[in-house]
Amino acid sequence: MRAISRLTGASFNTISKLMIDAGKACAAYHHENVVGVSAERIERDEIWSFTYSKQKNVKTAKAAPEGAGDTWTWTALDADSKLIVSYLVGGRDSSYANAFMEDVASRLTNRVQLTTDVHKAYLEAVEGAFGYDVDYAQLVKMYGKLSLIHI
């Protein structure tokens, strides 16, 4: 934002307010228009970031604001169209998982194949939001040295 301020000559506060207003407008547009989605495959994941400082440094940070620390952006993506069906910014616990999955389910019109990682909070959240009206899979990500199998 400082670079935008320097390039445009607009004050940093003006740029900040514009970004906040644009974000609110985009969120309202998404909430009102991304409904009744007919999708076949939904991929779910979360992205880690931090607000002000990493969680481990919040206690020693100078004047850390409320909400400082780890921040997670939950996303639900239509695997075919790449539409973000739903998103949520917050923590990574079961209360956020439940709220997020309820929102995802409310935006869909049909039974979907839903894929998540193995975060334990998903099991209860998916069942609570979709009941039995979902084909659910957890993708286990395996890291490390690859082994090639010759046939």
Regions found by a protein language model. Name each.
Residues 1-37, 47-50, 79-83, 91-95, ...:
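Short, positively charged, Gly/Tyr-enriched micro-motifs
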Residues 37-66, 75:
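Two-metal-ion RNase H-like nuclease active-site motif
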Residues 44, 77, 87, 115-118:
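Short His-Asn-centered micro-motif
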Residues 61-93, 101-102:
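Short conserved beta-strand segments at catalytic cores or DNA/RNA-binding microdomains
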Residues 97, 122-124:
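Short, well-ordered alpha-helical microsegments
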Residues 111-122, 141-142:
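Acidic/histidine-rich, metal-coordinating catalytic segments
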Residues 135-145:
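Inter-helix linker motif
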Residues 149-151:
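Conserved small/polar residues in nucleotide/adenosyl-binding loops
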